[in-house]
Amino acid sequence: MVNIILLIVSALIGLILGYALISIRLKSAKEAAELTLLNAEQEAVDIRGKAEVDAEHIKKTAKRESKANRKELLLEAKEEARKYREEIEQEFKSERQELKQLETRLAERSLTLDRKDENLSSKEKVLDSKEQSLTDKSKHIDERQLQVEKLEEEKKAELEKVAAMTIAEAREVILMETENKLTHEIATRIRDAERDIKDRTVKTAKDLLAQAMQRLAGEYVTEQTITSVHLPDDNMKGRIIGREGRNIRTLESLTGIDVIIDDTPEVVILSGFDPIRREIARMTLESLIADGRIHPARIEELVEKNRLEMDNRIREYGEAAAYEIGAPNLHPDLIKIMGRLQFRTSFGQNVLRHSVEVGKLAGILAGELGENVALARRAGFLHDMGKAIDREVEGSHVEIGMEFARKYKEHPVVVNTIASHHGDVEPDSVIAVLVAAADALSSARPGARNESMENYIKRLRDLEEIATSFDGVQNSFALQAGREIRIMVQPEKISDDQVVILSHKVREKIEHNLDYPGNIKVTVIREMRAVDYAK
């Protein structure tokens, strides 16, 4: 910075000196001109007459020369000032370049110093770490030295004891001590390994179950025991009841469903614990309303027709569920059996949806463990199929399911899965265990089942089974939410007098075998029909 100031000052001084030099020269020229003028005037005085013209000429010449000299001097001064300015600028430029180079060198030197400082810091840290490590090693060596000294003292003491023993006795003592130490160490390691394996197994199982539950979004609606049928107007209620209640009695006796007609506008309630019978009654009632012809013969015709239609719908439900679960080549009879589960509930949970859910969960778990996914899904889907027919065949749903699985030549893993999913038989495969876990997941999750609903349905089912256990009974239907049991008998086996006796026997068996609130009305119906055709 000082050099720059000096350069600027030098330039200013040069300019001042140049201007002063030019002024001096101009002054000298002026003085010379004045002197010449004076001489001319003197000569003019002497030779006035002759010199007037010459004096004028000389005067003009002097003026021209003075102007010429002034211009020349100005040009020379400007040229010198220009040259001097260029020299100063050149020097200033070179000084500036030197300053830039100096700044660059200083910056590089600063970076170099910073790097060296960082290197020194890192080396200092490394040295501190090594020093700490050496200190720790020194402490460890001291501790080991103390242990060695202690062991030497113990060995000396042992040797003093062994000195009085034979070689065999000494060897036996040493082997026993070594065995005790190794046994303790091995036992500790085994316990640690078992604890670690158990923890990892539990964690893995929880992860698998959590993943399976997150990947399955099942839909579920709690099953009901009533169905509402909407009427076009309230006048239809009288036609449904019929003359002296013939129509409604015929519908109830053929379907086993309680038809409730109350003050609710334009609605008839169908109540019954068997979803298949309730659905047949709903289809029949809706067909009667749409057709307009409501009488006992038409009711019988539509009930029979809707029973056949229900068989087709059951097959369609089974096919849709088998397609959803991915169970190809399923026997047609098994498809129909699975379709019937759409109308079965377990603790209020739809059994067909439960079976599909178990199949999907078992497939997810099998995929995580590298097992056969398709077989796991099939086994999970079929595990509860015995519930579809356990009312018609003796035995638990597990035994019935095993029998039908063997009958239709299902895979042995599927048979064992059905047999073991409630713990009655030991599982023979990983898939059987996975299906049992999936079954527990599906049924035990909050909201899946309703204990009170299942108890209610079981009470109605037991009520019907008591009635049908007597010889000569054709059908029995629990009505009025279990407050009435209506029994249809075979007229060729049961006489009018035996009807009264049968009602008393049924009442006594109900009182001894069932727990129920209030009273249960037992109604036995014997109907004799004679049909002939005129030709």
UniProtKB/Swiss-Prot annotation:
Sequence segments annotated as region (Disordered): 118-141
EC code: 3.1.-.-
Protein name according to UniProt: Ribonuclease Y
Taxonomic path: Bacteria, Bacillati, Bacillota, Bacilli, Lactobacillales
GO cellular component, one term: plasma membrane
Top-rank taxon: Bacteria
Membrane topology field: Single-pass membrane protein
Function, in words: Endoribonuclease that initiates mRNA decay.
Keywords: Cell membrane, Endonuclease, Hydrolase, Membrane, Nuclease, RNA-binding, Transmembrane, Transmembrane helix
Alphabetized GO MF terms: RNA binding; RNA endonuclease activity
Transmembrane segments: 4-24
Domain KH: 225-285
Matching InterPro entries: HD/PDEase_dom, HD_domain, HDIG_dom, KH_dom, KH_dom_type_1, KH_dom_type_1_sf, Ribonuclease_Y, RNase_Y_N
Domain HD: 351-444
Places the protein is found: Cell membrane
Family recorded in the similarity comment: Belongs to the RNase Y family.
One GO BP annotation of this record: mRNA catabolic process
